[in-house]
Amino acid sequence: DMTGPDGKRARTAYTRYQTLELEKEFHFNRYLTRRRRIEIAHALCLSERQIKIWFQNRRMKWKKDNKLKSMSLASAGSAFQP
């Protein structure tokens, strides 16, 4: 847990493999049980906290993407109204 000059924790750089595995897990389940979080942390050599925060961030991205998708569908639908 390296900290920068401002006392903040250094940003975690996930490997391609870790990201792929986390995305795969997220695809099946947007929320993790503590047991599953521990399993993933051990399998990917990450801390439980890193897994928890990755999932929090990913859920926010998912929410934002879905909001944008529904907005673009709504505006596309209204464009075709006679």
Curated annotation (Swiss-Prot):
InterPro entries the UniProt entry points to: Antp_homeobox, HD, HD_metazoa, Homeobox_CS, Homeodomain-like_sf
SMART domains: HOX (SM00389)
Chief place where the protein resides: nucleus
UniProt keyword terms in alphabetical order: Developmental protein, DNA-binding, Homeobox, Nucleus, Transcription, Transcription regulation
Listed GO MF terms: DNA binding; DNA-binding transcription factor activity, RNA polymerase II-specific
A Pfam family recorded for this sequence: Homeodomain
Keyword presence, Cell wall biogenesis/degradation: no
Compartments, record wording: Nucleus
Keyword Transcription in annotation: yes
GO cellular component term, pick one: nucleus
DNA-binding region as annotated in the record: 7-66
UniProt function note: Sequence-specific transcription factor which is part of a developmental regulatory system that provides cells with specific positional identities on the anterior-posterior axis.
Family: Belongs to the Antp homeobox family.
Protein name as it appears in the record: Homeobox protein Hox-B5
Organism: Gallus gallus (Chicken)
Gene: HOXB5
